[in-house]
Amino acid sequence: MFSEYIAANGEPGRTLRFCTWGGEEEGLWGSIAYVDEMNQDLTENLRLYVNLDMNHVDIDYENRGNSVTLFTNDADDYKHIEAIAEEYKKDNPMMAEKYKINLGLYDGPRGAPNGMPCNSDHCPFVYNLDGGNTIGRAAVCYGSGSLEYHTYLDDISRLNEESLGISATIYGNYMKFLAYNPEQ
């Protein structure tokens, strides 16, 4: 999606950086270490961290849940994500009927019921910038996932590929918007 858009529209005004944390559960290089090492650059330049962690619906969505939840800690980001999600629903009525798309704004202080949860890789990007003096902006998607997540039964067989497209499309379009509109 991005390469085709860049080819047609030129270089964006912002840099998009993609990070994966596949070994973090084994104590390997992860988001906390990355933020520690890149803290000054991230404090000065990070506009939004998008976390797609377990952002799918279980393959047995009829019995195990059919929802994805997209949430952020910034009201302006929420407004844009909400508008893109509504467009997605209009453009993809079968997907919108099949899967429940929830939205949330968690802009309260850390640990508060309305605060951004600190339970995944987005946490250090939100709360560890500039020694904790700068609150970073994040957008996260959680799916209803699978009961086997983080157990010895956690494998690709529970993955519902189709449901990955919801968050990838909504957040991908928002990232594209931010990349080409650096004043936002």
Language-model features and meaning:
Residues M1, K79-E87, T169-N173:
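Long, highly charged amphipathic alpha-helices
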Residues M1-I6, R14-G22, G30-S31:
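Extended, hydrophobic alpha-helical segments in both membrane/secreted and soluble proteins
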Residues S3, I32-D36, G172:
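Short, well-ordered alpha-helical packing segments
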Residues E4, A8, R14-L16, S144-Q184:
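His/Asp/Glu-rich mid-to-C-terminal helical/loop segments that flank catalytic regions of hydrolases
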Residues E11, G23-A139:
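Metal-dependent peptidase/peptidase-like ectodomains
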Residues F18, Y34, P109, N133, ...:
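Generic preference for well-ordered secondary structure
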